[in-house]
Each structure stands twice: as structure tokens, then as C-alpha cells.
């Protein structure tokens, strides 16, 4: 009897062990190699803000982790942790994330060499390691990144020869290697935009246009949404002894089937969201109207940041905390279809410069056109000139130079060139460092793809419109130069263009008033009273001279924006001023400067720049005085 009990207990023990073995083997999964690679990356980085806090090495699913983006097939396609104060080194294990399309680790303190393993990522399209402390050479095998489109390694300490293999990447459209210690020569690139400024060993023997630094870009903003996680805790099934081996196996199989079914349903929901919101055009993201409607609280009036001739701008906030500015374009019924709209957007997106507002994405439908931009925390120059505390003189000078560089890029370095058509303080935005960022460029064409026989109104802002544009409808780079001159006067005086002269009960044209004070050497009467005595009188006088040069009556007499940049930086102003001062036209503008004739044949005299006639006009109101065809470059 005792022997039988012992035999029974041994058999039962064996069955119990088999039960747990089968249960564990069926319900467990092999370690995900992507998890292993990501944990290695985490372990080599110092994370002061805890952004990798939920990266669990025992997890089987990294798609629930922050800073990770996954495809509908549950594969890691994006790694992005910009501006998180990360330090340490970048692990070579990143090369095991073979499905990566985007790596965005800019604005950190990561040091060491760029791991050569990163060049083994066959699907990588975007690599941004800018503004870190990487050193050593750029891996020579970088040409293996055959799908790479966007590469930023600027502002590091990289050295060694300029990697000629970069020219072998067929789809590369943007390259920024500025401010490193690379040495030449520089080969020809398929990239439409590239920058090598700030590399002394290259630039001292290179052409000026290669090292002008005019193509430095705003950081690419990559949206990496965290996917919903799958259930990672497997219920430890402790089966009662009395149920036996067969019941244990059945329960285990049932549990695994249910878990996999739930995972598939979750992945379907994630896939639906990605296909709605991530249909991008190059580096642009295509948003759904529903996403932007939710982000802006239904485009509520409380979310409005500003209003202009092209439409309202709303503050938007996505679920991941990203804050953006959403411009809802008006008058879209007459615009062209999505194809032409997206083509124009692609051209705007190629205009990449630190002093140009970067386009993040768009929404295009039969009834809506929306553009999504980064949110500028310091607002516009127009709003800051009225805010407290007042902008100091050095900041105003910095704004003037930054805005000039942005327009210089649009006019002379962008291909095709872009004419802004509405240069004013409200369209010059300020980032967190009070760097000037030119906004609203290229929008005139987005809203004017009508048939050739259809006319459109002159677009601009009262007080900023050049006389030739108002009278003929023909715009050029010199139209923008005129508007920039008015902007300089606003920076000096702290007033809007229509307020010039009102402060001293001046009833004449405002430019004549400014010229009169300058000629009488009464510059201090022009300076914003909020500055007190904390400004450099010589610098104010020089900026005033540049403003007067920019606002000359004849477009041919105005300088190009490249010349404006040089003069603001202290080069060539005296010579240009002396030459212009000799022309009789400078102080005696033609009366047609202030008189225009309407298209119906009736003479209507309007003091374009005086205090009378526009006292009740709003500075943001677009002027639609005449219907006439616009032509010329973009």
C-alpha cells in the first residue's frame, strides 16, 4: 500500500512538472532583439530627466515605451529624444534596429564617436545628431544608407576628411555638417540643400557660397507617438493539483490564444491612427482635420494667436504635449487641388534656414487648407514691441540682422526664389532665444493658383506696401526690401507704421517726416522712449540710414537683401549712403508715391504713409484695393 502511494505521488509530481513546463514554454516568448538593442542604448546614456524610465529590459514589447515609434507590424521605426540633456555615448547596438527610419537625438550632450553600426540601417531616412559633442570621423560607410534623405551632424566636434561617400547617397536632399572640424575637399552632392560653414579647414580654401552659412536649418521636428502597449504581464497560472495535466494544458492554450487576439486588436487600432496621421510628404507630416480640430479645441477663439490676410493662427497642443501653431487658410474655395497644393508645400519645405519658420506639416481637403508650424514662445516682433519689458537695443539689432538674413536666403539662395510680399513686424516671429524667424513666406502662391484669366487682389499690409506694387500689382524682391525698411523703422521707434508721425501731430507722409528728422540730426526724436538712454546713438543712426535706403521710391535704387545684410553688419553702408545721398530723388519722392489712380478711371488721392486716411485701419488687415493680376517669381 505504501509502495502504491509512493508511485502515485511520483507520477503526480512528474505530471505537475510537465504541466508547468508546458505552460511556461507556451506562454513565454523569446527575448525581442529590438528590446535588447534599446536597453543597450539606454544603458550607455545618462538620462537626467528620466525619459527612458519605462524602458523595461524584461518587456517583450518596446512599442509602449516613450520616445519610440512603431509600425503597424509592431517593429521599431523611430527613436527620438531631442533636447533631453542626455549625455554618455551612443551604443553600436543601434545597428540592430534594422527597421529604423528616423533617429532624432539633436540638442543633447552625447559624446564619443558616431557608431559605424548606424550605417547598417537599410531603411533609415532621417538622422539628426546635431548640437551634441560627437567627435572623431564620420563613418566612411555612410554611403550604405541608401534611403537617407535628411542628415544633420552640425555643431559637434567631428574631425577628419570630408566624407566623399556622402555624394553616393542617391536620395539625400538635405545635409548639414556645419561647425565641425572637417577638412576638404567638398565633392558635388545630390542634396538640394547643404551647409559646411564653420569648418575652418574647408572654408579657408573654398568658394564663399559654400561657406556662407546661409543654409543652416531649424531643427527637424520628428513626431514620435508612443503606441499603446500590449499586455506584458503573463498571468502565472498555478493550477490546482486535482485538475490534472490535461486541464492545465487546455487552460494555458486558451490564455495564450486570448492574449494574442487582444494584441492583434490593439495593433489594428494603432495602425488606423498612424495611417490617418502619418501620411507625410518628404519631411512634412500630413495631419487629419480631426487631429488639428482636437489640438486647437475646435479652433476656438481662445486658441487664436493672431489674425492676418491669409487666415487665423491657432495654438494647438497634441496628446504627447507638443505645442504647435496652426494656420487655417481662408479663401480656399478657389485654390487648386491637393496635388498642386502639396507641390507648393514641398517647395516651401525646401526653404530651410535658421531665420525662416519651418513648416512641420499640413492638412489638405476639399474645403480646408491648414499649415502646422512650430510654436514660437516669444510671439511676433509686433507684439513684443508693445509688451513689457521693452526689447533692448541689442535684441532689436539682432532681430533686424536675423530677419534680413532670412529674406536674403529667400531672394538669392533659394531655388526657386521666393518673394514674401508681406514683410512686416507681425510676420517676424521670435524663438525662445529671441532669434528672428520670418514667417508666412510662400503663402501668396498657395492661395493664387487660379486660372490665368482670373485676377486676384494686391496682398499686403497698409503702411508696408511698396508704391510700385500698389500701383501695378507687380511684385519683386525690391517689394520685400521696401517692407523690410519699414520694419527697421518700427524697431527703432517702437511704433507701427501707421503710428509714425501721429506722436508729433505730423500730418504729412511718414517717410518724409522720418527723412526730415534725420536730415535735421534729430534722431533721438525717433527712438522708442521705452529704450530711455540705453541705446547706441551711432548704431541707431546707421540702422536708420539702412531703412531710408530700403524705402526709396524707385525699386532700382533700393539695395538687394544681401547688401542690406552687409550694411547691418557694418560693411559698405557709408559708400552706399554717399552714393544715394547724391541722387535728387532720395529726399524728393515723386508725388505719385502718395497718389494712385483707381482702375475705374476716377482719381483717388490717398496718403499712403501719412496719419490721415488710415487712422482707423488695422495693421493686420490685408489691403484689397485693386483687382489686378500678380505675376513674377514665387
Curated annotation (Swiss-Prot):
Q: Tell me where the transmembrane regions lie.
A: 237-257
Task: Give the keywords, sorted.
Answer: ATP-binding, Glycoprotein, Kinase, Leucine-rich repeat, Membrane, Nucleotide-binding, Phosphoprotein, Receptor, Repeat, Serine/threonine-protein kinase, Signal, Transferase, Transmembrane, Transmembrane helix
Keyword Transmembrane helix listed? The answer is: yes
State the membrane topology.
Single-pass type I membrane protein
E.C. number(s) listed in UniProt: 2.7.11.1
| Sequence ranges on the Extracellular membrane side | 28-236
* Biological-process GO terms, alphabetical: anther development; cellular response to peptide; homeostasis of number of meristem cells
Tell me a Gene Ontology molecular-function term this record carries.
Answer: coreceptor activity
Task: Please give the residue ranges for the topological domain Cytoplasmic.
Answer: 258-634
Work out whether the entry's keyword set contains Transferase: yes
Pfam families from the UniProt entry? LRR_14, LRRNT_2, PK_Tyr_Ser-Thr
- Which residues carry attached sugars according to the database record? 96, 109, 155
Catalytic activity of the protein: L-seryl-[protein] + ATP = O-phospho-L-seryl-[protein] + ADP + H(+); L-threonyl-[protein] + ATP = O-phospho-L-threonyl-[protein] + ADP + H(+)
In the record, Phosphoserine modifications are located at 380, 383, 471, 476
> Which InterPro entries would you find in this protein's record?
Kinase-like_dom_sf, Leu-rich_rpt, LRR_dom_sf, LRR_N_plant-typ, LRR_R13L4/SHOC2-like, Prot_kinase_dom, Protein_kinase_ATP_BS, Ser-Thr/Tyr_kinase_cat_dom
Chief location category: membrane
Q: Which SUPFAM superfamilies match?
A: L domain-like, Protein kinase-like (PK-like)
- Which residues does the record give as ATP binding sites? 305-313, 327
Residues where Phosphotyrosine occurs? 469
Q: Which GO terms describe its cellular component?
A: membrane
Leader sequence segment: 1-27
Modified residue Phosphothreonine is at which positions?
296, 322, 395, 455-456, 461, 472, 551
Q: Which domain of life is it from?
A: Eukaryota
**Family from the record:** Belongs to the protein kinase superfamily. Ser/Thr protein kinase family.
Which protein are we looking at? Probable LRR receptor-like serine/threonine-protein kinase At2g23950
Q: Which organism is it from?
A: Arabidopsis thaliana
